[in-house]
Amino acid sequence: MVSPENTNWLSDYPLIEGAFSDQNPTFPWQIDGSATVSVEVDGFLCDADVIKEPSSRKRIKTESCTGSNSKACREKQRRDRLNDKFTELSSVLEPGRTPKTDKVAIINDAIRMVNQARDEAQKLKDLNSSLQEKIKELKDEKNELRDEKQKLKVEKERIDQQLKAIKTQPQPQPCFLPNPQTLSQAQAPGSKLVPFTTYPGFAMWQFMPPAAVDTSQDHVLRPPVA
């Protein structure tokens, strides 16, 4: 092994230099150790750089490939998640059936379902509004019926009070009126009196009792005036 500190190692061996000069006197053997070694060392260093260069390039390329692979993996994962979402949406739109794989068809089904739900919600909203109006009308009618019932109740109480007042008043005694036929028979057949028509009954004085009409005891009870 040659130490890197002593690059001119051939100059340290003079015997070898002399032997080479004795055997071949005509051929000048010049040893320039520093140049040769420097060339060899430089060549070795250059080769080392050349060797290191491709490895570094390969390393850079590998790192770039690794980055691109991770990006592709992330993109693939994102697409897989998106496909899972579409599959879930298809199963929700059509439960009990095989999920679709066509994304356009799934989106069209979702749009149709949303529009249908929106129309149904609008119909229910209109129905709710009409029911609210009917409830308001029924409440007003109920209030009117309650007021009318209260008025009828007050009117009934007033009529009952009037009937009670009429029942408590004293009734007049019925008067005796002769029969019109009896009056016509009492008249003489040859009389020239015109028969009078009877009038409706009205209150008259009652007849006096017989005891009050008896005059047999007048001379005792009422002496004659002198």
Curated annotation (Swiss-Prot):
Localization in the cell: Nucleus
Gene3D superfamilies to which the protein is assigned, alphabetical: Helix-loop-helix DNA-binding domain (4.10.280.10)
This protein's UniProt keywords: DNA-binding, Nucleus, Transcription, Transcription regulation
Entries under CDD domains matching the protein: bHLH_AtILR3_like
Domain spans labelled bHLH: 66-117
One Pfam family recorded for the sequence: HLH
Broad class of the protein's primary localization: nucleus
MF terms in GO: DNA binding; DNA-binding transcription factor activity; protein dimerization activity
A GO CC term attached to the entry: nucleus
Single GO BP term: intracellular iron ion homeostasis
Top-rank taxon, per record: Eukaryota
Subunit details: Homodimer. Interacts with BTS and BHLH47/PYE.
Record's protein name: Transcription factor bHLH115
Lineage summary: Eukaryota, Viridiplantae, Streptophyta, Embryophyta, Tracheophyta
